[in-house]
Amino acid sequence: MALWGGRFTQAADQRFKQFNDSLRFDYRLAEQDIVGSVAWSKALVTVGVLTAEEQAQLEEALNVLLEDVRARPQQILESDAEDIHSWVEGKLIDKVGQLGKKLHTGRSRNDQVATDLKLWCKDTVSELLTANRQLQSALVETAQNNQDAVMPGYTHLQRAQPVTFAHWCLAYVEMLARDESRLQDALKRLDVSPLGCGALAGTAYEIDREQLAGWLGFASATRNSLDSVSDRDHVLELLSAAAIGMVHLSRFAEDLIFFNTGEAGFVELSDRVTSGSSLMPQKKNPDALELIRGKCGRVQGALTGMMMTLKGLPLAYNKDMQEDKEGLFDALDTWLDCLHMAALVLDGIQVKRPRCQEAAQQGYANATELADYLVAKGVPFREAHHIVGEAVVEAIRQGKALEDLPLSELQKFSQVIGEDVYPILSLQSCLDKRAAKGGVSPQQVAQAIAFAQARLG
């Protein structure tokens, strides 16, 4: 039976019921709905709606239902209830009879669902933070094992300057640390309880909402009932965090997809995260990474969809808000899955150091070092830049690296160049000179690894 049937003289059209019902997705809030109902039953004792004995009976029945749901969650989807609130209330009435009908006193589904969703978000943020830190740790471990793996760094997908695979790993540690911070910030703002705000104007019972919030593990209660039942900022914030986090994972995936190509050949992915071709026997495809990259789009879509859903809504609750859950559930599930999969990709990745070094020595990645050398000799940087550009053209014409040009050739471009230029052009020198904070020098990379290890514990 619907929770609102008394006002109506005709039954809902079955097509409308199917269109309107949300149990097929909000069943995921079952545990939170039951936990919230236990807390609400305690609050009803404080205002005389329930006796202590009645509350104990309700709490016992709800706890039995909670264990039953955990053991067999699929039972919920076997029901034709409108939503998870109706399902829980119906099951409670089955267990305790008329007493179960007293539980909803002073409560609306508007504050109830807002509370359920916030509780679910808190639980899920905890899972995301754990997975995020696990991936950071995997990246730090990979960095530690590859501090001396020199490879080309890229701008515009053109070889630019030499870096190390460790430095590349640590770049993604920084991105993930920002993702972690965004989740922690979002958690602070969603950690306020809307329960007790009723449909929109507040409850008519003098319930201590701060005490109620504490029972549910919230930091405090919300301050405005109208805002509380309308607020979905926490959904937008988490979707935004997920969208940004998935962009980072997509870039991570794209880098490794490129590094894994035959053309680059910098890494070899484990058989555990790759698949083959049904036609071409030689293929080993980076499917895990391609799926991470591909799933980024659906998360961006969820954020955009929720923005558009909320942008024109008047206060307070509107049924449009039922659309907040499917996109949120899918986006955070996707982000969590991709965090786990990215860590699995790193577990077993092989860095092909000789090929990385060979590539770093190609493409004139040491050209900037020659320009800096000229600057140290008193040549203005813009002039040095032009001189080195001409030297690179000549080296390309001869099919040689800069360091393979004889001194006589180099001096055609500038007489200040001496024999001391050759050590400067080595890969190790290129790395060693980047010793400012955040640079690619071995000392800076080692410090960055130590800092990340200390932060992650």
Curated annotation (Swiss-Prot):
A GO CC term attached to the entry: cytosol
GO biological process, alphabetically ordered: arginine biosynthetic process via ornithine; L-arginine biosynthetic process
Primary subcellular site in the record, as a coarse category: cytoplasm
Record bears the keyword S-adenosyl-L-methionine: no
Record CDD domains: Argininosuccinate_lyase (cd01359)
Cellular compartments annotated: Cytoplasm
Keyword tags: Amino-acid biosynthesis, Arginine biosynthesis, Cytoplasm, Lyase
GO MF annotation: an example: argininosuccinate lyase activity
SUPFAM superfamilies for this protein: L-aspartase-like
Catalyzed reactions: 2-(N(omega)-L-arginino)succinate = fumarate + L-arginine
The keyword Thylakoid belongs to this UniProt entry's keyword annotation: no
Xref: InterPro entries: Arg_succ_lyase_C, Argininosuccinate_lyase, Fumarase/histidase_N, Fumarate_lyase_CS, Fumarate_lyase_fam, Fumarate_lyase_N, L-Aspartase-like
Family: Belongs to the lyase 1 family. Argininosuccinate lyase subfamily.
Protein name: Argininosuccinate lyase
Organism this protein belongs to: Escherichia coli O1:K1 / APEC
Protein encoded by which gene: argH
